[in-house]
UniProtKB/Swiss-Prot annotation:
Belongs to the ClpX chaperone family. The keyword Transferase does not apply. ATP-dependent specificity component of the Clp protease. It directs the protease to specific substrates. Can perform chaperone functions in the absence of ClpP. Component of the ClpX-ClpP complex. Forms a hexameric ring that, in the presence of ATP, binds to fourteen ClpP subunits assembled into a disk-like structure with a central cavity, resembling the structure of eukaryotic proteasomes. Residues 5-58 form the ClpX-type ZB domain. It comes from the Bacteria. The gene is clpX. This is ATP-dependent Clp protease ATP-binding subunit ClpX. One of its GO terms (cellular component) is HslUV protease complex. GO terms for biological process: cell division; proteolysis involved in protein catabolic process. NCBIfam families: clpX, PRK05342.1. PROSITE patterns: CLPX_ZB. InterPro entries: AAA+_ATPase, ATP-dep_Clp_protease_ClpX, ATPase_AAA_core, Clp_ATPase_C, Clp_protease_ATP-bd_su_ClpX, ClpX_bact, P-loop_NTPase, Znf_CppX_C4. GO terms for molecular function: ATP binding; ATP hydrolysis activity; ATP-dependent protein folding chaperone; protein dimerization activity; unfolded protein binding; zinc ion binding. It comes from Maricaulis maris (strain MCS10) (Caulobacter maris).
């Protein structure tokens, strides 16, 4: 903006800051924008305000730490069941925030972090728990897949790429990234391939476990901002992983057999104690897991030692699967109902249909992950024909439709022409 005073020709061309009103002669620099100006002093003031806000978001006051109950309640909105695992995660995240506050107080006592291991059968909600945490946390969060990792120097992702993803989630703010949370999925896939030494290196198994040790415990990792080894001339960023919380999860297929065999002893001979095969559900058996079982499964002792908190997830029964289909905010039934609403058609699932879908998912042993593929198979033909159908008001799916013995019921709206003729 410009001002004029008393017809003075010099004042006609004088520019002023649109925020503080100082003239261009009173400040060092005046930056022009579309019809507005801002001086260097106002820019510095804005930067100071932003820095203070960043500090307050990085290190919250004690009253601002989300309580475990608050985190638990939010997880309940999206994840059905798994109360024990949700409590473990809620406490861990709450303590993570407290550790950040404690570190800022320069106390003599250093609080060590407690990395978490989630164990549960496929489709029970491990990944969904991590994804839901990402929605509610006020710290940078990233997910990684252990199956893509290899030792440094081999084709594949380096372990440092995990830190790079966290850095990207923090918009390359190193200070924020150093207080983030990392979730590594499919951690059971990097178990040692065999107990016998081999002349070939296990670059995607034990080698990855060895590489993960340091960043999980705490080290200064050199991270290439552009990733990979394609830009050897780039400057590396130094990220301290001491305050990064690591949550790792896996299905650990076969671990239940390792646990069941523990302590059974020999069953050979006349006086042997012959036992029946363990008939318990997988989730019940996994609840008894001990570090020695993980060692026999193929994790190295050093890696298990850096995961002091172990949470096991339960198998999902019919009731839980029906709840998953209907209750969460992003439930599958609600998603398909929304798709049908876009065509102006309602969609209804009867109670026996929901139970039949849950039974099929249990039979497939895919947990909640198999629900979507079952729903797609049931509704495929209906979704194909729906845009070309006229007058359909509602589609009803019952148990016979799920079992393949009938087609979905189409309810047609009464036409206005028919109503007029009747009148």
């Amino acid at each position: 903006m410009s001002k004029t005073t008393g017809g003075d020709s010099e004042s006609k061309n004088t520019l002023y800051c649109s925020f503080c009103g100082k003239s261009q002669h009173e400040v060092r620099k005046l930056i022009a924008g579309p019809t507005v100006f801002i001086c260097d002093e106002c820019v510095e003031l804005c930067m100071d305000i932003i820095r203070e806000e960043n500090k307050s978001s990085l290190v919250k006051s004690k009253e601002g730490v989300p309580s475990p109950q608050e985190i638990f309640n939010v997880l309940n909105d999206y994840v059905i069941g798994q109360a024990h695992a949700k409590r473990v995660l809620a406490v861990a995240v709450h303590n993570h925030y407290k550790r950040l506050n404690h570190a800022s107080q320069n106390s003599d006592v250093e609080l060590a972090k407690s990395n978490i291991l989630l164990i549960g059968p496929t489709g029970c909600g491990k990944t969904l728990l991590a994804q839901t945490l990402a929605r509610i946390l006020d710290v940078p969060f990233t997910m990684a897949d252990a199956t893509t990792l290899t030792e440094a120097g081999y084709v594949g992702e380096d372990v440092e790429n995990i830190v790079l993803k966290l850095l990207q989630a923090a918009d390359y703010n190193v200070e924020r990234a150093q207080r983030g949370i990392v979730y590594i999925d499919e951690i059971d896939k990097i178990s040692r391939k065999s107990d016998n030494p081999s002349i070939t290196r296990d670059v995607s198994g034990e080698g990855v476990q060895q590489a993960l040790l340091k960043i999980m415990e705490g080290t200064v990792a050199s991270v290439p901002p552009q990733g990979g080894r394609k830009h050897p001339q780039q400057e590396f960023l130094q990220v301290d992983t001491t305050n990064i919380l690591f949550v790792v999860g896996g299905a650990f297929a076969g671990l239940d057999k390792v646990i069941s065999q523990r302590g059974q002893g020999s069953s050979i001979g006349f006086g042997a104690d012959v036992r029946e095969p363990d008939a318990r559900r997988t989730g019940e058996i996994l609840r008894e897991v001990e570090p020695d079982d993980l060692l026999r499964f193929g994790l190295i002792p050093e890696f298990v030692g850096r995961l002091p908190v172990i949470a096991t997830l339960e198998d999902l029964d019919i009731g839980a699967l029906v709840q998953i289909l209907t209750e969460p905010k992003n439930a599958l039934v609600k998603q398909y109902q929304r798709l049908f609403e876009m065509e102006g058609v309602g969609l209804t699932f009867t109670e026996d249909a929901l139970k039949a879908i849950a039974n099929r998912a249990i039979a497939r042993k895919t947990g909640a992950r198999g629900l979507r593929s079952i729903m797609e198979g049931i509704l495929l033909e209906t979704m194909f024909d729906l845009p070309s159908l006229e007058g359909v008001e509602e589609i009803v799916v019952n148990g016979e439709v799920v079992d393949g013995n009938a087609k979905p019921l189409s309810i047609y709206a009464e036409r206005k022409d028919d109503k007029r003729e009747g009148a």
